């Protein structure tokens, strides 16, 4: 999958409009990988489940041992895809970094978009400042915070849905919110 994405990126390199912005995003994500680490209690709760998911072992009755094996975040399935044999579990925080960077960039685009109404721009600015002040380090939040950040983005899109009169934009918002 990575090689397919890299090939498509190289072939479509001439179609990228803002190449400097793309380099900035890639640099931020790369620095985030180097600096970030997992949450302090990651080894106690989420590591075992992510390793079990990545090794694809079917084990019955684990919920009888501990309640955390019965109820888990769906993001742990995503974390388990980043188990690489050489690096082992050191890339389990990659989805956290991807989501955090994407949400920060999306909210900053919403803040600077002059076509948005003032209320939406203030909401995006307030949400962006909250995220940047609350999560100054990547290790300060666990795997469940990503869902809450996505809810902030969903609330923004819901408000935009009710404030806009553009039918095409409403359809796009419904598709994005459904994903």
Describe these PLM feature segments.
Residues 18-22, 115-125, 169-175:
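Membrane-interfacial loop-to-transmembrane alpha-helix junctions, especially the N-terminal start
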Residues 113-117, 154-172:
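Membrane-interface transmembrane helices that cradle and orient dolichyl/undecaprenyl
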Residues 1, 16, 87-91, 137-146:
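Membrane-helix interface and helix-disruption motif detector
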Residues 5, 18-41, 130-132:
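Transmembrane signal-anchor helices characteristic of membrane glycosylation enzymes that use polyprenol
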Residues 98, 124, 133-158:
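Multi-pass, polyprenyl lipid-linked donor-dependent membrane glycosyltransferases
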Residues 135, 172-179:
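Membrane-interface alpha helices of multi-pass inner-membrane proteins
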Residues 30-121, 138-140:
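Active-site lumenal/periplasmic loops and adjacent helix-entry segments of GT-C-fold
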């Amino acid at each position: 999958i990575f090689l397919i994405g890299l090939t498509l990126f190289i072939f479509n390199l001439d179609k990228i409009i803002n190449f400097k912005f793309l380099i900035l995003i890639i640099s931020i994500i790369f620095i985030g990988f180097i600096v970030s680490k997992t949450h302090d209690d990651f080894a106690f709760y989420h590591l075992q489940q992510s390793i079990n998911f990545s090794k694809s072992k079917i084990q019955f009755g684990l919920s009888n041992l501990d309640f955390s094996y019965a109820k888990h975040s769906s993001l742990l399935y995503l974390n388990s895809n980043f188990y690489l044999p050489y690096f082992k579990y050191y890339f389990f925080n990659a989805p956290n970094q991807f989501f955090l960077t994407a949400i920060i960039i999306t909210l900053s685009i919403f803040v600077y978009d002059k076509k948005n109404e003032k209320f939406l721009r203030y909401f995006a600015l307030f949400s962006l400042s909250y995220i940047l002040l609350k999560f100054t380090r990547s290790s300060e939040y666990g795997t469940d915070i990503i869902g809450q950040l996505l809810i902030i983005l969903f609330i923004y899109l819901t408000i935009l849905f009710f404030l806009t009169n553009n039918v095409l934009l409403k359809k796009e918002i419904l598709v994005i919110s459904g994903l």
